[in-house]
Swiss-Prot record:
Pfam families: Formyl_trans_C, Formyl_trans_N
Family in the record: Belongs to the Fmt family.
InterPro entries assigned to the protein according to its UniProt record, in alphabetical order: Fmt (IPR005794), Formyl_trans_C (IPR005793), Formyl_transf_N (IPR002376), Formyl_transf_N_sf (IPR036477), Formyl_transferase-like_C_sf (IPR011034), Met-tRNA-FMT_C (IPR044135), Met-tRNA-FMT_N (IPR041711)
Gene Ontology cellular-component terms listed: cytosol
Catalytic activity: L-methionyl-tRNA(fMet) + (6R)-10-formyltetrahydrofolate = N-formyl-L-methionyl-tRNA(fMet) + (6S)-5,6,7,8-tetrahydrofolate + H(+)
GO molecular function: methionyl-tRNA formyltransferase activity
List of residues binding (6S)-5,6,7,8-tetrahydrofolate: 108-111
NCBIfam families with a match to the protein in the record: fmt (TIGR00460)
Function (record text): Attaches a formyl group to the free amino group of methionyl-tRNA(fMet). The formyl group appears to play a dual role in the initiator identity of N-formylmethionyl-tRNA by promoting its recognition by IF2 and preventing the misappropriation of this tRNA by the elongation apparatus.
Name under which the protein is recorded: Methionyl-tRNA formyltransferase
Keyword set, alphabetical order: Protein biosynthesis, Transferase
Record-listed E.C. numbers: 2.1.2.9
UniProt key word Cell membrane: no
Length: 303
């Protein structure tokens, strides 16, 4: 099948690799190179790099909502468009531009976690089950019919990297299966029950509320690493917690109290034992190395 591929981050790479092997990728659309590093060099997206290596034409328009881009897509000889974490809303004119429309890989149990950050919200909310869906896109926000779906059981302390890697590779396999049977698949409409929205994360959400349970804070730490990071402030410095453990211990301390010299912190329920953290503008350190340079005393109440 002749395919136009739209995607940007590492999450989309396994699918593009599979499409290159099994189908004919006619064009790739990805976000424009972004300034990176101290020298502010222009870094191509992972998808741009992969397409370049395989000599596939690459386009990086600033928007899909203009006649120039729509006309370009109409001119590409393709049967279908595959969209994964592209970063732009796809207008109706493009959704309907090809015979089989636009397919999307969405890593959640739709209609739960529609939106921009399903992987992060799955972890932050402590979900122990999820899914990967192949969806035919429509004009709504992740409201399209489901062509194929596979459920996942999640480990209680799964990290964002682990979940992303698992869903990316499963999604690639499911998409290839979908394309092989696309003329025979009966689309399934999404339920109107259980709809939630996985809104894009904000930096403000990363601030830790010590009155939450230790487990809830641990979920936030795992779901927000690397960005925006779950953080607290100490001596007017922002400190991100990169890794921690939660302990279901009863206690009588005010939430936010440091109860040991190993940075164990009382929460609304339970204790959070910090194991890796990073002060703003400094490198990440394990707890022992961090405490050698920043002494957070027992009985300190963190804000």
């Amino acid at each position: 099948m002749k395919v136009i591929f739209m995607g940007t981050p590492e999450f989309a790479v396994p699918t593009l690799k599979k499409l290159i092997i099994h189908h004919e990728v006619k064009a790739v659309f990805t976000q424009q190179p972004k300034a990176k590093g101290r020298g502010l060099y222009l870094a191509k997206s992972p998808i741009h790099q992969l397409a370049f290596e395989h000599q596939i034409p690459v386009y990086s328009p600033s928007t899909l909502r203009n006649d120039e881009t729509i006309n370009l897509i109409n001119k590409v000889d393709a049967d279908i468009i595959v969209v994964i974490a592209y970063g732009f809303i796809v207008p109706k004119a493009i959704l309907e531009a090809k015979k089989y429309g636009c397919l999307n890989i969405h890593p959640s149990d739709l209609p739960r976690h529609r939106g921009a950050a399903p992987l992060q919200r799955t972890i932050i909310e402590g979900d122990l089950k999820s899914s990967v869906c192949i969806m035919r896109m429509d004009s709504g926000l992740d409201t399209g019919d489901i062509l194929l779906k596979e459920d996942l059981n999640l480990e209680k302390r799964i990290t964002l990297d682990e979940l992303s890697n698992r869903c990316a590779h499963l999604g690639a396999e499911l998409l290839i299966q979908t394309l092989a049977n696309i003329d025979n698949i009966v689309p399934v409409k999404q339920s109107s029950n259980g709809v939630t929205y996985a809104h894009k994360l904000t930096k403000a959400e990363g601030k830790i509320n010590w009155y939450e349970s230790a487990y809830s804070i641990d979920c936030k730490i795992r779901g927000m690493n690397p960005w925006p990071g779950a953080y607290f402030s100490y001596n007017d410095k922002i400190i991100k917690i990169l890794e921690a453990e939660y302990l279901n211990y009863n206690h009588h301390f005010i939430p936010g109290t440091v109860i040991s010299n190993k940075l164990e912190i009382a929460c609304g329920s339970g204790i959070l034992r910090v194991t890796k953290l990073q002060q703003e503008s400094k490198k990440a350190l394990n707890i022992e190395a961090f405490l050698r340079g920043t002494n957070i005393l027992k009985d300190t109440i963190l804000k």
